[in-house]
Amino acid sequence: EIMPSLVGSEMCIRDRGEGVCMLGPVRFHYGCHTRVGNHCFMNFNFTVQDDAPVTIGDHCNFGPNVTIVTPMHPMLPDERRGMVCDDGVERFLCYAKPVTIGHDCWFGANVVVCPGVTIGENCVIGAGSVVTRDIPTGSFAAGNPARVIRPITAADTVRGRFPGIRG
């Protein structure tokens, strides 16, 4: 389900699974480079700058204001200025690295995922984190830069807090 306040009828995503819910506004720079798995939830202000491929697994949830970026820009000032190419046209240097997110991941509010990052399956990324490097499967990671805090284990269950809930 895509909520009416999303972005407009011209928005496209390369591949969107079943049962995806996006609470607008959400934004995709291109959209054609993004794949979203089944039963994912994107809260408001979810933003993907998909200059390179972005792959999101099944059953992923994103809190408000999560941003995924793939472009890389030069560090040196003279390389950030326009450069004239052999064809005489001024261009700005930029390249991009793909982002991959495994199945069953949860992202708290205000998380930023940086270019080239792979996040394994069954991960939780704490609110406000800036993910600059890969996160292994089954990890809770948080901070700026994000680091693995600990593995997620059966002791993390909340089922006992909700009597009558099964599943």
Where are these regions (language model features)?
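C-terminal/domain-terminus segments
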Residues: 112-146, 158
